[in-house]
Amino acid sequence: MLANENSLLTMFRELGSGKLPLQIEQFERGKTIFFPGDPAERVYLLVKGAVKLSRVYESGEEITVALLRENSVFGVLSLLTGQRSDRFYHAVAFTPVQLFSVPIEFMQKALIERPELANVMLQGLSSRILQTEMMIETLAHRDMGSRLVSFLLILCRDFGIPSPDGITIDLKLSHQAIAEAIGSTRVTVTRLLGDLRESKLIAIHKKRITVFNPVALSQQFS
């Protein structure tokens, strides 16, 4: 966990112990946290798990723009614009999650009273913008093998834990969940993961993926 993430979680806990009405919410995997068009009434801090943010288009196509890790803040568009607005993204629990949520008007006051909170939040948002750019680049690949590899490398960066064999992605990932994230099908993802296992680039144990050598994996479809 990064220092600024520690600070952010600590600040939210401190705010919750004061006058700020901090609410704890839990969602099972696949449950919607908010839909596009919902009124933006609360700001969220992800305490445990992972949340998928996606953009839904009129055609029905849904594109993943970010996969948020623990200690990420989201639902903050109104804070950035200074105006009340509706939700822009579809937020879904990618794994079972626990959230802190705060009414947006109270969060606005807290940012004025504690400027350091704004600075820490800005650092977190900068990291998310980088991940969104990487996700867009991932989805630009027409080849599903390249798309899957790019996605696994993003997960190594944001959810990876060093292990004796390489980098273990600290998420339980079903083939269906991966397929939904990269715009593929479960059958295709199962086949591609099988190919990577046969090539001894990854291992899968209890739905957790270990990448033996991220550099070698990145060269798989280059």
From Swiss-Prot:
Residue intervals of the HTH crp-type domain: 142-215
Organism per entry: Synechococcus elongatus (strain ATCC 33912 / PCC 7942 / FACHB-805)
Any one GO CC term of the record: cytosol
List of residues binding a nucleoside 3',5'-cyclic phosphate: 6-128
Keywords: Activator, DNA-binding, Transcription, Transcription regulation
GO molecular function, one term: DNA binding
Domain of life: Bacteria
KW Acetylation (keyword) present: no
DNA-binding residues (ranges): 175-194
Protein name as catalogued: Global nitrogen regulator
Its job: Required for full expression of proteins subject to ammonium repression. Transcriptional activator of genes subject to nitrogen control.
